[in-house]
């Protein structure tokens, strides 16, 4: 039996989707949001804190994923009675009262597989099904099967999934693509948004909003029917990201929305909670304690919001790249997020038109145009010649170049002259022997140099191609694929991230060991293999020599930068 759709009708506040410009109200009906499952740190209170602080497990995620064997209130009561007794053994207490997550079986691929064969063979290995879960499980049920990243990640993750789905589509698994879109739509209907992952402790935040792009991907196979089917969920997700906008005054922020002094509306990353993350409890407490000059709750919120960005962690969010406790994610307006919001507005316009609602389509187009102007005005650093994040504290665009700067090109929001400058900056500052650097800063954090990540390689490749910069796009794909191939030849696996300063080495840094699998690397690798090799002669491994760039398949943009006041 598949888990049913939410049984109680949801009621969601009417969304003034075009209030930003025309102050006309748009009503979107949703159903009444059910009771939100409580995360383990709330369910277990002091017991959760004590277990995590005791470091019973090498990975803090282990206990966050453990399932209570009975009512957590009863377990907590027993703990309070027993904890001060002579000979009390906390590890034994945990073993008796909780079911710990099982280690996944080690997958041993068949000998002699090509890179493509290896990836195609991994899809069933990484597929999970959780139509039903235990009552106190932190895992949230989903109606359809889904593909997980791999390694310690035993659940589905929001933005990872889009790049995984690109690979599923490339392999012809459109049924799995449709299943995953249906799952994310189910989460929007059930919780009002797509959480970071399908765990109760991820519900307080989302991740980079790729749902509309997932629907657009599915529409490549199913046509406009997919756009019309999921239009209500896309509208609900948009409402989540814009929640609170109707009450904002110039210069204010509310949750995920920012209203600048001139009335420009942009978005930021935000987590609704300001406590340590259950899956990184001890690390977050240590980070907060290391900076007594800031309230711990402020640091916790910024750590959580960085997790919402997908870039956890990066010098991009920090004042001092060597000190994580200086991060201030919530006071930064990210260029990648606002590019994705622009794309969401464009797809909403397209879906509304497909559904026969031209008036609503025009309103979404108006919103997209306004956001595009905001991106060009606030998220372009004219002095440096690249897109960058905007700093709400200094009221200036930041100077740091990161791979996120390619997102305006990826969503076709960039002016052509600026896209050309981005191509130069990318080749000069970010391109390395093993692919695209995330940043040029070595901080020890995993979203910094020398690490390169598959989704950013694809965003850059596709974005540069959109503007006719095919040589740089080919360089990125070729360098990254060579890295993936060399690592695979040696270790017979694909990994989460790569050291791009060389080829054949997995990346380092971060809060946990390097993970293999790996969903989004698999997806991007397949897309790139099919990009560099002609369709009439597809390649199963990376060719020995760099292919030449053929005639453009994508029309470059003809937009020029508009002067900003």
Swiss-Prot record:
Coiled-coil residue windows: none
Positions binding substrate in this chain are: 152, 159-160, 196, 205-207, 277-279, 310, 511
Can you tell me which residues form the catalytic site?
A: 312, 496
According to UniProt, the reaction catalysed is: alpha,alpha-trehalose + H2O = alpha-D-glucose + beta-D-glucose
Q: Could you tell me which SUPFAM superfamilies the record lists for this protein?
A: Six-hairpin glycosidases
Gene3D superfamilies linked: 1.50.10.10
Name of a matching Pfam family: Trehalase
E.C. no = 3.2.1.28
GO CC annotation, single: outer membrane-bounded periplasmic space
Per the entry, induction is: By growth at high osmolarity, is regulated by cAMP.
The biological process GO terms on file are: cellular hyperosmotic response; DNA damage response; trehalose catabolic process
The residue range of the signal peptide is: 1-30
This protein's source sits in the domain of life called: Bacteria
Where is this protein primarily located?
A: periplasm
Task: Answer yes or no on keyword Signal.
Answer: yes
Q: Where in the cell is it found?
A: Periplasm
Q: Does the keyword ATP-binding apply?
A: no
Q: What UniProt keywords are attached to this protein's entry? A: Glycosidase, Hydrolase, Periplasm, Signal
Region entry Disordered: which residue ranges? 538-565
An example molecular function term from Gene Ontology annotations: alpha,alpha-trehalase activity
- State the protein's purpose: Provides the cells with the ability to utilize trehalose at high osmolarity by splitting it into glucose molecules that can subsequently be taken up by the phosphotransferase-mediated uptake system.
- Subunit composition? Monomer.
By sequence similarity, the record places it as follows: Belongs to the glycosyl hydrolase 37 family.
Protein's recorded name: Periplasmic trehalase
């Amino acid at each position: 039996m598949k888990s049913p759709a939410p049984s109680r009708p949801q009621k969601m506040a009417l969304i003034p989707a075009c209030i930003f410009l025309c102050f006309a109200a748009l009503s979107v009906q949703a159903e009444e949001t059910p009771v939100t499952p409580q995360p383990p740190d709330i369910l277990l209170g002091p017991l959760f804190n004590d277990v995590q602080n005791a470091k019973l497990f090498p990975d803090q995620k282990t206990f966050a994923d453990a399932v209570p064997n009975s009512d957590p209130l009863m377990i907590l009561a027993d703990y309070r009675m027993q904890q001060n007794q002579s000979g009390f053994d906390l590890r034994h207490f945990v073993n008796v009262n909780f079911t710990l997550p099982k280690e996944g079986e080690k997958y041993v691929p068949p000998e002699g597989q090509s890179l493509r064969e290896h990836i195609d063979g991994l899809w069933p290995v990484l597929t999970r099904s959780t139509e039903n879960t235990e009552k106190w499980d932190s895992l949230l049920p989903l109606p359809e099967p889904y593909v997980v990243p791999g390694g310690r990640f035993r659940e589905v993750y929001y933005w990872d999934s889009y790049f995984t789905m690109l690979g599923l589509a490339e392999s012809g698994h459109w049924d799995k693509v449709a299943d995953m879109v249906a799952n994310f739509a189910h989460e929007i209907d059930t919780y009002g948004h797509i959480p970071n992952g399908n765990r109760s402790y991820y519900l307080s935040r989302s991740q980079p909003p790729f749902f509309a792009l997932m629907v657009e991907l599915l529409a490549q196979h199913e046509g406009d029917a997919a756009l019309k089917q999921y239009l209500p969920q896309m509208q609900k997700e948009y409402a989540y990201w814009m929640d609170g906008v109707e009450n904002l005054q110039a210069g204010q922020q509310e949750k995920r929305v920012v209203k600048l002094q001139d009335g420009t509306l942009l978005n930021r990353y935000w987590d609704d909670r300001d406590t340590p993350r259950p899956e990184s409890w001890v690390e977050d407490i240590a980070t907060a304690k290391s900076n007594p000059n800031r309230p711990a709750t402020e640091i916790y919120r910024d750590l959580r919001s960085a997790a919402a960005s997908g870039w956890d962690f990066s010098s991009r969010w920090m004042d001092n790249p060597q000190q994580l406790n200086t991060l201030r994610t919530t006071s930064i307006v990210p260029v990648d997020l606002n590019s994705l919001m622009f794309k969401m507005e464009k797809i909403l316009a397209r879906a509304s038109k497909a559904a026969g609602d031209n008036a609503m389509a025009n309103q979404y187009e108006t919103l997209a145009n306004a956001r595009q102007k905001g991106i060009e005005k606030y998220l372009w650093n004219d002095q440096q010649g690249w897109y960058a994040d905007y700093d709400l504290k200094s009221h200036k665009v930041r100077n740091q170049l990161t791979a996120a700067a390619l997102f305006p090109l990826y969503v076709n929001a960039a002016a052509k002259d600026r896209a050309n400058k981005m191509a130069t900056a990318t080749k000069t500052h970010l391109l390395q022997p093993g692919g695209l650097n995330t940043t040029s800063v070595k901080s020890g954090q995993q979203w910094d140099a020398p690490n390169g990540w598959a989704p950013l390689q694809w965003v850059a490749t596709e974005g540069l191609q959109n503007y006719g910069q095919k040589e740089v796009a080919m360089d990125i794909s070729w360098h990254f694929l060579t890295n993936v191939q060399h690592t695979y030849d040696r270790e017979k696996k694909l990994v989460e991230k790569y050291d791009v300063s060389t080829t054949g080495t997995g990346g380092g840094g971060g809060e946990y060991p390097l993970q293999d699998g790996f969903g989004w690397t698999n997806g991007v690798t397949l897309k790139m293999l099919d990009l560099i090799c002609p369709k009439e002669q597809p390649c199963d491994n990376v060719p020995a020599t760099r292919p030449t760039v053929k005639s453009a398949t994508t029309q470059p943009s003809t937009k020029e930068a508009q002067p900003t006041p």
